[in-house]
Amino acid sequence: MTDQTLRLENVSPYLLLILDYFEKNCINKTDLFSIQGNQENVNRIISNIKNFTPTKQFEKDLNRGLYSRHDLSFSIINILNSLNHPLLLENYNEAYIVNAYYEDIERIKQTLLELPHSNLEIILKLFSTFNLLCNQEEHKSFLLLSPEMLGETFAFVLMRFKKTKDEVDQFGNKIFATNVISYLISHFNEIFDSTILDFEQKEKKSRENAILFMEYAMRKYTSLDNHFKSIYNKYIPHKRDLSQEDVQTIKTEFNLRKYSGKSKIRPPIPIYM
């Protein structure tokens, strides 16, 4: 049984690097998910992620060709299987199944946009890779890289259901999940184009807000740091043992500056929308 302990926020930087490399170097091959990768290499990739290997080193290993395309394809499956929650969160299963069945693209978009940003970021990249795989000219007659076969391969990787011993229920869940994944791949351009725009706008706004807040925090920190340095340089270098009078002077000066600064105009705190 797969150890489902990986957290997506920890995995994302590594998985995005793998998918990016995979998309650039491996999608012109037809045997990607039909041949098992080297288990030792797959385990090494998982171990490097768990041990928080620096992403630059991780990327360097990829670019050195340390892993084969089969190592990477099965690592993608293993990583997704090891997440503590699936990419397509369980509480949205019914929405995906019903909307895919009725081919309601707008509702599928809305459901996707309700996912956390970290989930949506990986989903966008993963299905972009699937779309490119299925649309390679040399793959169009190759059934193993059709939306239906990729849907079957990733059905229980991307979606999870309540455990059941009933074989009919298991089979039904597999059919539902396969249909959802293959539908998302087949209608990638219709579903994900506007979703990507909405997502990127949100991400851009979040990044801008984060930068504004960090700049504000840095100004506050620098101002306070300079204040304490000026007091330190004024008294500490000249006297190893501070007298009671020195201590009182420092306290007084600190308080005077503290309260005198209240009347100054300060930059507004960035508001997150």
UniProtKB/Swiss-Prot annotation:
The keyword ATP-binding does not apply. One of its GO terms (molecular function) is GTPase activator activity. Pfam families: RhoGAP. Its main location: cytoplasm. Keywords: Cytoplasm, GTPase activation. SUPFAM superfamilies: GTPase activation domain, GAP (SSF48350). InterPro entries: Rho_GTPase_activation_prot, RhoGAP_dom. Residues 1-192 form the Rho-GAP domain. Rho GTPase-activating protein involved in the signal transduction pathway. This is Rho GTPase-activating protein gacB. It comes from Dictyostelium discoideum (Social amoeba).
